[in-house]
C-alpha cells in the first residue's frame, strides 16, 4: 500500500516553484476574457479600475461591494471640489503591481487600503501588504499609506464611514491603522 504524499521532500519544493510560470501567465488570460466580457456587455473591467478625480490626492484601494459605496461618496466630494478616488481591485491573485501603478493617479499623496479580513499577529492585512510592497518597490516612499478593516461578519459600511475616511486622509498624519463602522 502507498500512503502519504505522492512526492518526497527532495522534489516537492522544486515542483512547487515550477508552478510560477502558470500563475505569472494568468493575468493575461484574465485580461483577454475581461476584454471579451467588456465588448459584449459594454463594461470596462480590468485587473484594476480607477474611479474618481484624475488628479486625486487621496485614494482608497479596495475590492468588493465597498467600492460601490465609495463611488457615491467620491461623486459627491468631487462635485464639491475635492480630489478623491478609488482603485478597485478586480484580480487579487496573482498580484500585478504594474497594473496597480498604471491606474493609481500620479498625484496621489495619501492612500488608504481597505481589507475585509483580520490577520491577527500580522503587520497588516493582505491587500494592505501588497499595496505597501508595490509602492515601496516603485520608489513611491512619499505616499502616505494607511490600512484598515471594514465589513467583517457582514457589518454594514455606510457612506458616512467613507466620508470619515477621506476626512481622516486630509490630516497631516492620518491614523496608520483603523477600522470602519465600529468603535474600537
Where are the regions a protein language model picked out?
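Peripheral docking tails and interdomain loops at the edges
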Residues: 110, 114-184
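Residue-level recognition of beta-strand->loop/alpha-helix junctions
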Residues: 88-90, 149
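Solvent-exposed alpha-helices and their adjacent loops that cap or buttress functional pockets
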Residues: 51-54, 103-105, 138-139, 172
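Conformationally flexible catalytic loops at phosphate/diphosphate-handling active centers
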Residues: 1-50
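A general structural motif
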Residues: 29-45, 62-69, 90-97
Amino acid at each position: 500500500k502507498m500512503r502519504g504524499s505522492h512526492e518526497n521532500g527532495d522534489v516537492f519544493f522544486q515542483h512547487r516553484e515550477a508552478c510560477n510560470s502558470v500563475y505569472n501567465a494568468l493575468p493575461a488570460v484574465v485580461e483577454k476574457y475581461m476584454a471579451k466580457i467588456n465588448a459584449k456587455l459594454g463594461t470596462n473591467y480590468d485587473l484594476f479600475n480607477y474611479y474618481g478625480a484624475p488628479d486625486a490626492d487621496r485614494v482608497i484601494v479596495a475590492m468588493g461591494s465597498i467600492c460601490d459605496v465609495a463611488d457615491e461618496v467620491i461623486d459627491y466630494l468631487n462635485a464639491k471640489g475635492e480630489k478623491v478616488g478609488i482603485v478597485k481591485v478586480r484580480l487579487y491573485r496573482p498580484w500585478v503591481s504594474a497594473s496597480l501603478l498604471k491606474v493609481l493617479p500620479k498625484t496621489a499623496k495619501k492612500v488608504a487600503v481597505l481589507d475585509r479580513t483580520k490577520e491577527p499577529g500580522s503587520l497588516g492585512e493582505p491587500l494592505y501588504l501588497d499595496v505597501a510592497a508595490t509602492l515601496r518597490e516603485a520608489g513611491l516612499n512619499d505616499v502616505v499609506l494607511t490600512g484598515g478593516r471594514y465589513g467583517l461578519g457582514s457589518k454594514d459600511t455606510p457612506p458616512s464611514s467613507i466620508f470619515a475616511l477621506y476626512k481622516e486622509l486630509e490630516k497631516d498624519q492620518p491614523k496608520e491603522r483603523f477600522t470602519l463602522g465600529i468603535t474600537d
